Amino acid sequence: MRLAIAIIGVVLLGGGAQASPETLRFVITRNSEQIGTHTIAINRSGKEISVSLSTNLTVKILFVTAYRLQHNETERWIDGKLLTLNSTSDDNGTRHTVSAAAKGTGLEVKVDGKATVVDANIMPASFWNPELLKRPVMLDTKDGQIMPVSVRDGGEEDVKVDARTVRARRYTIDSRYSQDVWFDDQGHLVQAKLVASDGSVIMYRPL
């Protein structure tokens, strides 16, 4: 069974430079059962931002591993522009390496050693950078595919987070798959949701 599971990373929307690193941890569930974790580490120094992301999940059905994903990624940004990106993925046995580097007015992307130059304004689909919500195309950092994207503002909703109810704005991001993310009025991620190819509900919630 192959599950289409997005790699979701989110930080605060906006905000100024921070001297200390940020580490964000999320638990990933499938139909309310924990299947993995997602971690984002962000270091800010003036106009430079370095980001490390890690996703590890395993889906078991009747004690048999049906799907496994391991993804590790680093990004380096200066003054809002992507300088370099490197990722490795093991998607249920299918391995990919993806890299990107600024080259002239474009972005050179290498997928499993094959290079192409794309528009420098394409955003990685790691979702930590809220600028992605404004762009029509993104780079899937798991396998290097260039994907058109559209974003719909679903308005504000009440979302239960542990024992609290949080007022949050919902965005639906449509691309190879559709997923929803919710942000509170401070720009914090409240939760994320997508429906996998087998109909199961995948949720990302902060630890």
Residue ranges and their predicted role:
Residues A4-G14:
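Bacterial N-terminal signal peptides
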Residues A19-G104, V109-G113, V118-L207:
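Acidic, serine/threonine-rich low-complexity disordered tracts
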